[in-house]
Amino acid sequence: MEEIQRYLQLDRSQQHDFLYPLIFQEYIYALAHHHSLNRSILLENPDYDNQLSFLIVKRLITRMYQQNHFIIFANDSNQNPFFGRNNNLYSQTISEGFSFIVEIPFYIRLIPSQAGKGILKSYNLRSIHSLFPFLENNFSHLNSVLDILIPRSVHLEILVQNLRYWVKDVSSLHLLRFLFRESWNCNPLIATKKRGFGFEPKRSQRLLFFLYNSHVCEYESIFVFLRNQSSHLRSTSFGVFLERIYFYGKIERLVEVFAKDFRASLWLFKDPFMHYVRYQGKSILVSKGTPLLMNKWKYYLVNFWQSYFDLWVHSGRVYINQLPNHSLNFIGYLSSVRLNPSMVRSQMLENSFLINNAIKKLDTLVPIVPLIGSLAKAKFCNLLGHPISKPAWAGLSDSDIIDRFGQICRNLSHYHSGSSKKKSLYRIKYILRLSCAKTLARKHKSTVRAFLKRLGSEFLEEFLTLEEEVLSLTFPRASSTFRGEYRSRIWYLDIIYINDLTNFQ
């Protein structure tokens, strides 16, 4: 953020949000490459010499507005290998810098102003770490849940309209439209069959991640506005959404599906115990309300997507579950509310009687079937969960093979340490342990039985530790009773940095 403040002269940008001139600045692409998670396409081109000048950017933008791309590349491919190597390289080049530039208006609003307004307060923004206290403290007291899959296919023009408030110069919006069309035509992996623009996280670049987040932010801003049943929002960060172009016109269009009276429509969804949680492309609405209220919310969400985003959303994308009877697959856990029966003896004068009492308790389980499917996809076992060797790693040294298997096992154990039952996790450890043994036996051209017998019981001892070692570091002076109490469920705050199973492939 300090680099942006130093180079971009935020005082002038903050007044008009004119971003188009920044496209012609060389340092923009250096900053974009520095902050981007993916390597820049330009830096991988050996003929480019790791530079992007004003003249090249101007030529790229000029070529983008030509009507016949084939004639241009046919004439210039022999003269300029930079443009002739890949037909859509120019649009990807501009996309690298434009994805960084279009985020500037969002960065500006997160910077405390120098006029003494202080730090921006946001009451409705929460991190992933707030999910765990929510599960522990509130989940067991709720009854119904709406399991929502956020639609990922959005019309191109709707994405541009969502950014009209943040990016006000017309040139940048036209350039954004062109980049959309190029991505739609050149990359079928991110284009839907009809008119929508699909988001594939593993295939997307930084611009697509930003567009998807802005789309979800737009969806949540109006959703939270209607949820709060107020003409203004409590959070300062959400207040800017009330000033968007045609905002109130969109609100009136939304409520037409329920009734003409705006206040009467909002009263139908009044619920003081409604909780909204989103993680990646999935969100949940949890409430103490009746099934009738949850059906109203389901009907509202389907019509909300169809009327505001012009999306045909099937009602099957929103599931209604009762927590005491169903499990919720969320953030890698199968969460449910389990009734823990208990019996209390009560005595009044000379009479004594027994009272049956059921206490609701949060139950988090490891989803064994999806994990086995992930292991099978990564070639650690078959679909039935039987361990197999990893031929791709057979050429590594013994220590490297053990380290890779051990790292995956530690990551899984660390992430699923919040599970209340560890039996499924032990099965996953067993699969990885035996797969490692089979890989080493394959390398040394031996059988697994002979290989394990030769190494003894000390082989792969790191697969059997993990929770106990981490717990001893977390609570070094705790008693055995205290440690036993916390061994059942521990939420670690660094699980978002854990690599998945496919990182070593």
Swiss-Prot record:
Keywords: Chloroplast, mRNA processing, Plastid, RNA-binding, tRNA processing. GO terms for cellular component: chloroplast. GO terms for biological process: mRNA processing; RNA splicing; tRNA processing. It is found in: Plastid, Chloroplast. Pfam families: Intron_maturas2, MatK_N. Signal peptide: none annotated. The keyword Chloroplast applies. Usually encoded in the trnK tRNA gene intron. Probably assists in splicing its own and other chloroplast group II introns. Belongs to the intron maturase 2 family. MatK subfamily. This is Maturase K. It comes from Chiococca alba (West Indian milkberry).
